[in-house]
């Protein structure tokens, strides 16, 4: 226990150091979100573009579904560690691309300039702000890579998540119009960023651990996760098409500006309203008596992995749900013919089945369905 407390205090101290070093995002001209079910947005011109970026340093460390969550490590309760988990739309602070492990820890503890957590919205259900931010960042990252190599055959290799993650880009003739090439790059980037998020949900369920020894099964297929990722992809798509990607600081400021606007458009609840919604689904969607390390703290999951989706809504609130989607094509280009997200076998697959060659997004529904069947069986056995 003394060791765990020491680790906690060390992380806290280093997080404060990081906050002192965080750069302020540049001011941005506010951009209105385009929160319609389908989007046909296009760039007016080929805006100035930043150089190819390094990928974000992992994902932000958030959020298990629920509030006032208690933790344990190696079966030992951590009384000094608790997660409030509720945020409000107008108090989300800044946005920082390429968040470090320490930055994520600071945000999770509530001491960062960038806030993460969950809130409830009338049209989008529960929204996980960390997932919104992560997929927005990955959309920018992929855009910076794709636009620089558009039309070329090449392979982008990412860090492993159980499987070896690779994106194979195929050779093709890009549009002659520079603005159309820009738009095509954005559409493809948003598509791939969402696919990356969907794989992360699958990997978590099958045993992926970003910190060795700490199971992430409690977060796998959380009801709000992929809708939040989809929202992040759509917001980033809008911003990049509006020319907000000439630098990381410009994009970060633009995300900080557009996020509260989008959440209010979705009908964001205040802190007490979100808390009330959590309480209404306690015992149905989550178990407030369980600690974070327990998989079935989460009782309700959403195993759908497609990027055309409704939010999972509690009780009789489905009528107000807003469907969001990403484009399947642009002009005559089918996006799935331009790039393929591939998951190759490794020697550290945990519980993930070994593919004949590699998994693709076409296999995601099958892998998710297997997870759902096993969870349903386990929940029945637990009753």
Regions found by a protein language model. Give the residues of each.
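Low-complexity, intrinsically disordered tandem-repeat tracts enriched in small/polar residues
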Residues: 5-6, 167
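Alpha-helical segment that forms one wall of the substrate-binding/catalytic cleft
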Residues: 228, 232, 236-238
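Bulky hydrophobic segments
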Residues: 21-218, 237-383
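N-terminal secretory signal peptides that target proteins for export/translocation
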Residues: 1-3
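Divalent metal-coordination and catalytic microenvironments
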Residues: 201, 225, 231
């Amino acid at each position: 226990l003394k060791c765990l407390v020491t680790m906690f205090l060390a992380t806290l101290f280093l997080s404060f150091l990081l906050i002192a070093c965080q750069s302020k995002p540049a001011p941005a001209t506010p951009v209105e979100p385009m929160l319609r079910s389908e989007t046909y947005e296009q760039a007016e011109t080929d805006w100035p573009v930043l150089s190819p970026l390094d990928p974000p340093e992992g994902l932000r460390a958030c959020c298990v579904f629920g509030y006032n969550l208690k933790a344990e490590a190696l079966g030992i309760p951590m009384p000094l560690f608790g997660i409030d988990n509720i945020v409000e739309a107008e108090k989300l602070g800044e946005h920082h691309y390429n968040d470090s492990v320490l930055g994520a820890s600071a945000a999770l503890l509530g001491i960062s300039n960038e806030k993460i957590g969950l809130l409830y919205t009338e049209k989008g259900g529960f929204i996980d702000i960390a997932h919104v931010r992560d997929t927005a960042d990955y959309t920018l990252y992929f855009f910076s890579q794709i636009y620089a190599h558009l039309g070329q055959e090449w392979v982008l290799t990412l860090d492993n998540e159980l499987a070896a993650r690779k994106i194979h880009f195929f050779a093709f003739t890009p549009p002659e119009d520079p603005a159309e090439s820009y738009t095509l790059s954005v559409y493809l980037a948003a598509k791939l960023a969402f696919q990356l998020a969907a794989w992360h949900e699958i990997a978590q369920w099958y045993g992926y651990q970003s910190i060795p020894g700490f199971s992430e099964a409690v977060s796998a297929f959380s009801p709000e996760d992929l809708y939040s990722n989809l929202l992040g992809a759509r917001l980033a798509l809008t911003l990049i098409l509006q020319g907000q990607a000439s630098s990381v600081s410009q994009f970060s400021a633009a995300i900080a500006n557009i996020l509260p606007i989008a959440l209010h458009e979705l009908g964001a609840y205040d802190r007490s309203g979100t808390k009330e919604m959590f309480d209404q689904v306690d015992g149905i969607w989550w178990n407030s008596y369980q600690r974070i390390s327990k998989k079935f703290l989460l009782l309700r999951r959403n195993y759908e992995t497609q990027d055309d989706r409704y939010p999972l809504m509690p009780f009789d609130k489905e009528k107000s749900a807003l469907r969001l989607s990403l484009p399947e094509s642009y002009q005559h280009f089918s996006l799935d013919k331009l790039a393929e997200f591939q998951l190759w076998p490794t020697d550290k697959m945990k519980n993930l089945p070994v593919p004949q060659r590699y998994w693709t997004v076409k296999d995601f529904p099958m892998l998710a369905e297997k997870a759902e069947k096993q969870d349903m069986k386990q929940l029945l056995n637990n009753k």
